[in-house]
């Protein structure tokens, strides 16, 4: 390996770019695709960290002095979910249950730690989305985070699922560092955000009830009017108990933008899912716990190029963003895909029924794009409808 770059972010796929040197100029690039890769960084004979993934792109570069340069892009096995697009309906499952079924479908090694209660949803629709886009949307919507540890994906609904107690020493003179645990730059800033989050929905069973919930991001606006509000008119809930987690997660996602830090270090152990403790910073408030949100590692080993390496030696450094290690980071909200227009479906029900309705007059339908559900009384969910020939006597109303 002559050079590498590793880009990582909470709740995103990592991308490892490798520049390799080989004596062979005839390596079959097609045979490399989707092959497993393990990349290790060793310092003073001690392994700092291992990154596991699959090859998603391979390029042959220049050949000179009996050596050929190859460029590989490595991403986690979860990336394979981008290759499959589907439309389907999941019935009466919680989001963690849906995510688990997706990961098992693609043979992804995973683990999770869930500290909160996650409601069972009547139905969840995947519509013309890749499996990964659907996965990422549900993760953000449900307030989950995911990251990668060795060859395994890990997801959690709390920062308590992260690995803590990674020590970093602040030293702005990085050239004097003798260990790979030095942070040589630390910046902390604040940004303006909306002051309040408001979610509203409508329950036809209680049409007069104002199904509205709010959360104040800025405590100074408690009980006051503000121009800066984030209002969602479609909250995706039917009960107060279901609304509170949605509002709280959106509140946390916006609040995460209020204060954020950035830094540089030589520590390859830093990664999303890690909480580090900073020490020896001249500002006392900085000597506390912080969690990694994004990080970009870059390393170079010129010796791999032999006579072309010049006088420079091996080096590794990174740039990263971080937030408080005591708060929960939430991914930015992802909106679900919208239908292009009217959807064609067939009204369904049990065999022998003229029309199958519930106590509220709702019907069940089977969408023509649904490849997984049978066209019977278990298809989709109960759907409200309006037509000219409705009412208790099926009479026409004009």
Residue ranges of model-derived segments:
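Amphipathic alpha-helical and helix-coil boundary elements used as assembly
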Residues: 1-398
């Amino acid at each position: 390996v002559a050079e590498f770059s590793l880009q990582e972010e909470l709740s995103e796929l990592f991308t490892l770019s490798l520049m390799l040197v080989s004596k062979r100029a005839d390596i079959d690039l097609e045979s490399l695709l989707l092959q497993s890769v393990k990349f290790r960084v060793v310092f003073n004979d001690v392994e700092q960290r291992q990154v596991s993934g699959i090859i998603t792109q391979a390029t042959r570069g220049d050949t000179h002095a009996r050596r050929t340069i190859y460029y590989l892009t490595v991403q986690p096995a979860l990336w394979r979910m981008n290759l499959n697009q589907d439309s389907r309906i999941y019935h009466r499952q919680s989001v963690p249950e849906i995510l688990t079924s997706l990961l098992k479908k693609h043979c992804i090694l995973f683990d999770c730690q869930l500290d909160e209660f996650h409601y069972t949803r009547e139905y969840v629709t995947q519509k013309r989305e890749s499996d990964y886009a659907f996965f990422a949307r549900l993760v953000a919507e449900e307030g989950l985070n995911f990251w990668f540890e060795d060859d395994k994906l890990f997801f959690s609904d709390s920062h308590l699922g992260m690995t803590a107690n990674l020590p970093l020493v602040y030293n702005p003179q990085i050239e004097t560092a003798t260990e790979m645990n030095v942070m040589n730059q630390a910046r902390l800033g604040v940004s303006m955000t909306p002051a309040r989050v408001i979610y509203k929905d409508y329950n036809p069973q209680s049409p007069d009830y104002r199904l509205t919930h709010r959360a104040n991001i800025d405590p100074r606006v408690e009980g006051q009017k503000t121009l800066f509000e984030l209002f969602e008119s479609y909250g995706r809930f039917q009960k107060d108990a279901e609304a509170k987690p949605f509002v709280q997660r959106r509140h946390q996602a916006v609040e995460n933008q209020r204060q954020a830090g950035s830094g540089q270090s030589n520590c390859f152990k830093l990664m999303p899912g890690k909480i580090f403790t900073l020490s020896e910073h001249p500002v006392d408030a900085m000597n506390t716990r912080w969690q990694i949100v994004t990080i970009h590692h870059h390393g170079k080993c010129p010796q791999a190029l032999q006579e072309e390496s010049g006088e420079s030696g091996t080096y590794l450094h990174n740039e990263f963003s971080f937030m408080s290690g005591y708060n929960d980071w939430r991914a930015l909200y992802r909106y679900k895909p919208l239908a292009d227009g009217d959807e064609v479906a067939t009204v369904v029900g049990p065999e022998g029924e003229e029309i199958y309705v519930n106590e509220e007059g709702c019907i069940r339908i089977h969408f023509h794009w649904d490849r997984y559900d049978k066209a019977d009384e278990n298809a989709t969910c109960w759907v409200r409808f309006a037509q000219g020939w409705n009412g208790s006597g099926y009479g026409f109303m004009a």
